[in-house]
Amino acid sequence: MSMKGISSAESDKLSRRISLTHKRNSEELDVFEAAVYFGYNEASSGDHGHTQKYGYNAAREENPRRWGILGGGRRISLDLPIRCSEQVYHLQQDHHEKHEVTTIKERLGNVRHKQPSSPGGKIASFLNSLFHQAGSKKNKSKSKSKTKPTDPEVEEEIPGGGWMRRRRRSSISHFFSSSRSTSTTTTTTASSSSKSLISSSSSGFRTPPPYLNTPTKNYKQFLNYTSATKQVGEEETKTNKEYSWLDEKLKVMESLSENQRIWSDDEDIDDDRRIKREGEDDGMESDSSSDLFELQNYELSRGGLPVYETTNVANINKTHI
């Protein structure tokens, strides 16, 4: 057989056969190649009979298990697995397409409609978002109040000027719940203590009863009260000491005031005496002045003038001239 009689298809088959032998030597897993299988069938429809026989024998030698050359020498058809694989492929493709369609629909549903870019539209969208937030927060607060109706403090959220203010209010039910909880705790502690006593008596060992909640707060309050009383007592002693020297000062002032009174009384007596003496002296001087005045009047009367005009200054000056 010459090199000219070998076609290009046969050269391809030879190269594939060489690659398969290399794979076998490398201990790799054999994989069914549909292109090689159908290539052999196409080559069998050629003009040269020797090429047909060569391709058939080569395929059988390459993978005898795939051609069904087993212990019995029967041939297994490969059409059935090919059809099954095609059906599985179509089913997978349909499932993938359906999944893509559902995801696209979900995306389109989640996409919000675009609002106009005008300032009025922006303000409207802003107000809508505020109202939506307020409504959602109110619903949350209502749900919290329903789930926890006996909370001591309930938070209320009030919208005001774009900001949320929180306000707390105390509920009276908290006191009832606390009283109930304390009563239940006391009953449980009493029952547990009785059970422990019974168990200890039955076993023969005596265990101490469980201690109640230690009144740490009351103890602290008592300490604070005692410390406060001590401080008040110390302050009172300090004030008493301060008032003691004030009392001494007051005594000194009273003694001084008594001395001043005595001295003032003496001065008053001396003043009275002086006034009496001065009064006596003034009477004597007045008599002498009146006598002189009368003498002058007598002199004026001697000049032949009337007595009732003697007090006039002009007349008196005339008489002296």
Swiss-Prot record:
Highest rank taxon of the organism = Eukaryota
Its localization reads: Cell membrane
Record flagged with keyword Cell inner membrane: no
Q: Where is the composition biased (Low complexity)?
A: 172-206
Keyword Transport part of the UniProt annotation: yes
GO cellular component terms attached to this protein's record: plasma membrane
Full protein name: Protein BIG GRAIN 1-like E
Tell me the organism's taxonomic lineage: Eukaryota, Viridiplantae, Streptophyta, Embryophyta, Tracheophyta
